[in-house]
């Protein structure tokens, strides 16, 4: 079963690699940053490991800035920054307790990595679980987990955790 989990992690990260900066925490090799992508906040994180086979496998980061200029690039009229963070966790058996610890870790790490301020539009934080078994309580907790947070009455954007 361990081999199936590793294959699932590799296939999932391969599909994210085109648009996301990937930082591996499971011993895998993090791909180098491509030209034009120079932001990688996940390297500052201390990884969440339950044991050798359970914990944070990788963090995928996506950053986008949209802006409008007037005649020159230095004359910026407006800008909007969008960020997405995917926390990929692996577990042999996902329990409600393990889910809550992973959820809290992903939320707190996502808040640390987010660049909140003027021009910030949104940050999406998504925990993704690859596991062998799931308790009913954990499945219910995963399905009902939604956290929304606004910054300065949405003037500095919002954070959506799902």
Describe every region a protein language model picked out.
Residues 19, 23, 109-117, 149-152:
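Short secondary-structure junctions and interdomain/linker hinges
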Residues 145-162:
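Charged, structured surface patches that assemble and position nucleic-acid processing machinery
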